[in-house]
Every structure is written in structure tokens, then in C-alpha cells.
Amino acid sequence: MARLHSGKRGSSGSTRPLRTEVPAWANITAEETEEVIVKMAKEGKQSAMIGLILRDSYGIPDVKLVTGKSVAQIMKDNNVYPEIPEDLFNLMKKAINLRNHLEENTKDIHSKRGLQLTESKIRRLVKYYRNTKVLPAKWRYSPETARLLVE
């Protein structure tokens, strides 16, 4: 598939192994995995980082195979998922960093374009999350509120 804001195709990546059961060497139960996920989520780690830590430190290749649920679903079930979805939060952090950069480097037109693309992606995501009732209907993106939410 093509990239969103360019005419190029995406670079190739590795595919996940087609596995339907937990490997024999992964010796951790579903309950223990959920406890570790909830503990890390309470420490403030995002679901992607939790997945990396589980893979590298605990030897869990795929949380969904072990528990039957994704990391985000486990976090939602235990009420430790953040109010603002992580993808939207990360995009807002990126937009804030770009704004800080543009305050110091006012003539950087390439970063200005990147900020425009990032903020339009934020607006599309906000529209989606409002329609799916993840965010309140009156929630709007503005750089000032994003700065307050992120910091």
C-alpha cells in the first residue's frame, strides 16, 4: 500500500509467523502475563513498550496467543488504559515538538509542512474517535490543550 502523504510505496517488512498455539518454551501463564501488563501500565508505560518488554525480558512472543486478548484490551479491562488513545497522544507529542522546533527555526518550511500533515492526521483521528464514542462529542484538538495534556 502507498504512504499517506507521498506517492511512494511503503518499504517491505517482516511478517509475523503463522502460529496458532503458544510455543513450548514460553512458560508463563495468562494470569501472570496480565498481572505484569497491569503493573507496567500503572507505571505509565504504553502498550507498545509493554509488548517489547514482554518479548525481550519475559520471553513472550505474542501476548494475544498467551492470553487471548491484546495488550490494549487487557489494559482496558483493568481500567488502566489512558483516557486519550495512545496513537492520538503520540501524534500530539510530535506536533508539540514540531511547534517548539518551529519557534526557534521559523524558516524551516519542511518542518512546517510536517506540522500541517501531523495536525491534519490528528484531526482525522479525533473525528474517528468522536464517532466511535472513545472521545466526548465536544472534544476538539487545539495546540494549547494538547500542550497541557502532554506536559
Curated annotation (Swiss-Prot):
<dbReference type="InterPro" id="IPR000589">
    <property type="entry name" value="Ribosomal_uS15"/>
</dbReference>
<comment type="subunit">
    <text>Part of the 30S ribosomal subunit.</text>
</comment>
<dbReference type="GO" id="GO:0070181">
    <property type="term" value="F:small ribosomal subunit rRNA binding"/>
</dbReference>
<dbReference type="Pfam" id="PF00312">
    <property type="entry name" value="Ribosomal_S15"/>
</dbReference>
<dbReference type="Pfam" id="PF08069">
    <property type="entry name" value="Ribosomal_S13_N"/>
</dbReference>
<dbReference type="GO" id="GO:0006412">
    <property type="term" value="P:translation"/>
</dbReference>
<feature type="region of interest" description="Disordered">
    <location>
        <begin position="1"/>
        <end position="20"/>
    </location>
</feature>
<protein>
    <recommendedName>
        <fullName>Small ribosomal subunit protein uS15</fullName>
    </recommendedName>
</protein>
<comment type="similarity">
    <text>Belongs to the universal ribosomal protein uS15 family.</text>
</comment>
<dbReference type="GO" id="GO:0003735">
    <property type="term" value="F:structural constituent of ribosome"/>
</dbReference>
<keyword id="KW-0687">Ribonucleoprotein</keyword>
<keyword id="KW-0689">Ribosomal protein</keyword>
<dbReference type="InterPro" id="IPR012606">
    <property type="entry name" value="Ribosomal_uS15_N"/>
</dbReference>
<dbReference type="GO" id="GO:0022627">
    <property type="term" value="C:cytosolic small ribosomal subunit"/>
</dbReference>
<dbReference type="InterPro" id="IPR009068">
    <property type="entry name" value="uS15_NS1_RNA-bd_sf"/>
</dbReference>
<dbReference type="InterPro" id="IPR023029">
    <property type="entry name" value="Ribosomal_uS15_arc_euk"/>
</dbReference>
